[in-house]
């Protein structure tokens, strides 16, 4: 078990594993409507079996080096998470994603957690491209991509059928050289 501090506000990033299914389900239940506005995660975890199954699918992805999932804890309570939806070492490309319950929103938790994931993907694993995809109406998610210094690559028109409506999906990305420059500039300005 490990935890990575996300700052001085008590926020931590930890692996989200199948044995945490009850805690994960309680978290999803607290934020079901909020979480489900733009992503299907709330519908994927409706009882303990489906919550455990969802987390198990990511344990299997991690074992195959094809994805990973982490929870964001704030003062000991699971309030959200981040993940590698896709992790393709052959293509040196991955896709990151996130979710939060309302109590975690507006604190910069996702931006800080995704920064940890991108650092690991680029600096440790040699990923060249990190993608972020979000429904065009999900302004909070799009603002995270902007804060991370990602570039808007384009829009996949009506590519995401969700709750009976086809949504446009915005594609954002950061390339390894760009990420290294951004992180170097942040380090220089912190001195």
Task: Annotate each PLM feature.
Residues 60-65, 150:
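Short loop/turn motifs at secondary-structure junctions and domain boundaries
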Residues 56-57, 159:
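A generic local structural motif
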Residues 1-23, 27-34, 69-191:
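Acyl-donor (CoA/ACP) binding surface of acyl/acetyltransferases
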């Amino acid at each position: 078990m490990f935890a990575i501090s996300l700052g001085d506000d008590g926020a931590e990033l930890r692996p989200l594993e199948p044995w945490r299914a009850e805690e994960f389900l309680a978290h999803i239940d607290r934020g079901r409507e909020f979480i489900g506005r733009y992503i299907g995660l709330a519908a994927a975890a409706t009882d303990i079996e489906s919550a455990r199954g969802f987390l198990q699918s990511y344990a299997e992805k991690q074992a195959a080096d094809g994805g990973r999932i982490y929870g964001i804890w704030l003062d000991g309570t699971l309030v959200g998470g981040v993940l590698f939806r896709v992790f393709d070492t052959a293509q040196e490309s991955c896709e990151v994603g996130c979710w939060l319950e309302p109590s975690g929103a507006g604190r910069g938790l996702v931006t800080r957690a995704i920064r940890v994931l991108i650092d690991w993907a680029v600096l440790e694993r040699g990923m060249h491209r990190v993608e972020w995809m979000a429904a065009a109406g999900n302004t909070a998610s799009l603002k995270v991509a902007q804060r991370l210094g990602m570039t808007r690559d384009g829009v996949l028109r009506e590519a995401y059928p969700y709750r009976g409506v086809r949504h446009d999906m915005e594609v954002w990305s950061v390339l390894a050289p760009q990420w290294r420059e951004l992180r170097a500039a942040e380090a220089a300005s912190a001195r």
